[in-house]
């Protein structure tokens, strides 16, 4: 049995995520943590950026991605399977750059630039003692179903 199980960028690839989570439940110790990180698809920034730039749903990627989650759908899925979500966070909403007019989907060079801006944003806050602000920012984004990734930390009820 384990104190913690992590699924980082895994759940969206599984043919039967419910079966997999139920199997994981069998190997968790009491009060163990299940940590999951998935892409936050179909969020408002993503779909608006798609519409503004006339893009296809570039994030739909079969056969690699079989499941698509938002914060709400991930939390509902886990609660249905007997988990209580203790913490929910997101990551930087890269799709925001699309709304700024930077179409990184069409131009890979812009993608690298947007990534560097995101890294600089986080580094500047951390270097200036604002780590708690950054954490609260990402939790607030998760509550709005925004952010590139959604991370949850949960326990069995």
Model regions and ranges:
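Conserved SAM-binding loop
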Residues: 1-53, 63-80, 151-157
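Extended hydrophobic-aromatic, low-complexity segments
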Residues: 44-48, 86-88, 97-98
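N-terminal start-of-chain detector that recognizes signal peptides
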Residues: 38-40, 58, 122-128
